[in-house]
Amino acid sequence: MESCNCIEPQWPAEELLMKYQYISDFFIALAYFSIPLELIYFVKKSAVFPYRWVLVQFGAFIVLCGATHLINLWTFTMHSRTVATVMTIAKVLTAVVSCATALMLVHIIPDLLSVKTRELFLKNKAAELDREMGLIRTQEETGRHVRMLTHEIRSTLDRHTILRTTLVELGRTLALEECALWMPTRTGLELQLSYTLRQQNPVGYTVPIQLPVINQVFSTNRAVKISPNCPVARLRPLAGKYVPGEVVAVRVPLLHLNNFQINDWPELSTRRYALMVLMLPSDSARQWRVHELELVEVVADQVAVALSHAAILEESMRARDLLMEQNVALDLARREAETAIRARNDFLAVMNHEMRTPMHAVIALSSLLQETELTPEQRLMVETILKSSNLLATLINDVLDLSKLEDGSLQLDSGTFNLHAVFREVLNLIKPIASVKKLLLLLNLAPDLPEYAVGDEKRLIQIILNIVGNAMKFSKEGSISITAIVAKLESLRDARVPDFFPTPSENHFYLRVQVKDSGVGINPQDIPKLFIKFAQTQTTGARNSSGSGLGLAICRRFVNLMDGHIWLESEGLGKGCTAIFIVKLGIPERLNESKPPFMSKVAVDHGQTTFPGLKVLLMDDNGVSRMVTKGLLLHLGCDVTTVGSSEECIRVASQDHRVVFMDVGMPEGFEAAVRLHEKFTKRHERPLVVALTASTDRMTKENCMRVGMDGAILKPVSVDKMRSVLSDLLEHKVLFEC
């Protein structure tokens, strides 16, 4: 035994125990060697593993542990020192590696524990995300239902259809057993069952609006759960054996109460709502979920908006119908007014013609009598007749002018005229009357007043004569001054007339005319009345001088046509009166100073001029008028030939006739003028053709000018007027009075 290098076991081996230890060490070694292989396999399969060095150490530790158990198989029997040395080395290495691994695990284990914490956190986060996704899906589903319901609700603008559709769609979407709408009554003190889901024509149950449950619902815009046994929820036809389903109620704002015929809300009440009640089925355990309540609230708001739109549409349709009725009534009134205006104009035209014809006889014969030898008493009577006839003729002219102004048919006849000559003509016309009444006339024309202007000369003269005539009528003594200036733009603003807006321009100017008298004056409160047609003041001493009351009314219309303004000023009775008017006149583009292209109608006193031997042809189908006009012409020394028809006029007319007076109101009157031009082709051979008419309409003048007449004279005609007409015609002046 001394030569054997073996280590004896310390105790005798038992065969059975040795056998079990041997087998156990073998399997332990096998397990230790398989674990690193498994770790290596799964680490290679893993894309991310942050602890590779730890794995190497752990693998080495396991391999060494397996090696010690494997070497330990040779230590159960007699073994050499070499085996003991290998065993020792293996255990030392195992101890070193195990200690290093243990030290490394001190740093690794917290990370491994935190990984578990993160895992739990991620699981919780994932669960939360799942819940949020569920909410999002629920919201999307709710939104889809809201859009669908909104589309159905707003697909019509009929109020009843909107409410019926709302109940049907809510019942289908939420699977409701019943859905009802309670509307306020006319008094606003009760709610009436108006619409239900299951009943087409619900019985009109009513409940007081002051119920606590109704106050609770009306106090919030959220859906409120209410008791199934409250009055507004008792809508089920059969009680059934199941527990009633949950019931919610929500208010529906009524934005347009008038459309619901609610007239008498309580004085302090702001509860302008309807009540919508929704019931879940009784045979289910369903409960109202949050998203369903939100859906109900949104639908209630959409119903309110749709009802508002429907109410607005109903109002607009009623307004349209009312407007159509008003338009029909206005159109009927317009047609009636046009018919009345045409009838009035036709009446005035006929009366004008029929009145001027006998007036022509009265004035003509009176003027003829005035130039005969009469006693003072006879002359006074003739002058009175002539004055009254002229006044009546003026009244006829005023009525016709006012009629044309009112229906808008009167238009200004603008042309270039001598403005200074207009004022001189007015002065010449009023001088005889002023001299009789011993009134001093003063005319002041501003140095910068243009000599020529563009406008309606005839209407301007008419305005000035009317105003000056009024001044003379109400002035027994003293003076009358006429002042004409170019108005400065800054002085035209008048606070009393806010709608008068003069505009500056290089092509026109504003003429300001002031007529001041020392007459009886006017009460300041009576001034506005003077511009009303047919209105007259009770001025002392003026009643005997009053006229028709149309003069100033017509003047105002003419001034307005000329883009002007007229007003009166007076400090009171006995203190005189000042009439001021402003009109807009044009400035001529250029003037030929040597020979103006126009002639102003300045009054010329022809005295007792006669026309001995002047051959005149007179055509008139009215025997009285023909006789009177012939008398005037004979009185002026003319050789007169009279005819009663156009055919006879064409046949009788010759080169010897200097003037042809024809009544264009008779049949074929204008045609006769045309045929005269055809008969006398040369201008110097044709007699002057003048219309003698009682028509004052614009068409008559246009027709006279169209057929080439040399003038148009308006009846009635006096001796002086006929004398002036003949003088102007022989001087080749064109005269158109109508």
Swiss-Prot record:
What Pfam families does this protein map onto? ETR1_N, GAF, HATPase_c, HisKA, Response_reg
Q: Which cofactors, if any, are listed as required?
A: Cu cation
- Where 4-aspartylphosphate occurs, the residues are D663
Question: Would you indicate the residue range of the signal peptide?
Answer: none
**Every GAF domain range:** 158-307
One GO molecular-function annotation for this sequence? Answer: phosphorelay sensor kinase activity
Transmembrane stretches, start-end: 23-43, 54-74, 89-109
Name of this protein: Ethylene receptor
Supply the source organism for this entry. Passiflora edulis
